[in-house]
């Protein structure tokens, strides 16, 4: 029972409920598993990082459009894509916004890196960096970090992260879906507990009473001894 009521208990409950639907004998399994379910975390206990691969691509697209407000005629060109094979995010058409786009080049971007390029780096968990191409003493070109422009771009990157944190939980439907998905993916496991209350110790002084944690520790030891 200890082993059955541990591990991915959400998945075990689904299996038990399917079994109970055709065989009432499994109803007792569902009752025990329901009691073993981890307490659901709520939104205030969940940290959703911009770039988390479990967040639906459509939500990132929605965030981008609502925050950067690209012109409607550009929205089909500027698209968030995610590759499950490489776990990499891409924003197509990120260079299409006009230089007059305030959100793209001032509020959330700079003249050297617009908001869409910065968002793409953020989704891929990269700090935005701005480089200049210069010639060295031998006339060869090399890239040199532009510290001033990099600092400015990273300030915009932080502004995008902050905007996402303010946005992600605002919509009740989105909040409910993300909370459910997070709990399903990352809060479904229950560690195994070892119950030693059933163990009887023959020949032991009846005046000696083992505490609960001592009995459980003995149960754990006995299980390990019995395992090959």
Q: How would you name each of these model-derived features?
A:
Residues 1-188:
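Charged, low-complexity intrinsically disordered regions
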Residues 178-181, 192-200:
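Short coil/turn segments at secondary-structure boundaries
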Residues 199-212:
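Dynamic helix-loop-helix/coil hinge segments at AAA+ ATPase domain boundaries and subdomain interfaces
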Residues 215-222:
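Pre-Walker A adenine-sensing motif
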Residues 223-228:
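Conserved small/polar residues in nucleotide/adenosyl-binding loops
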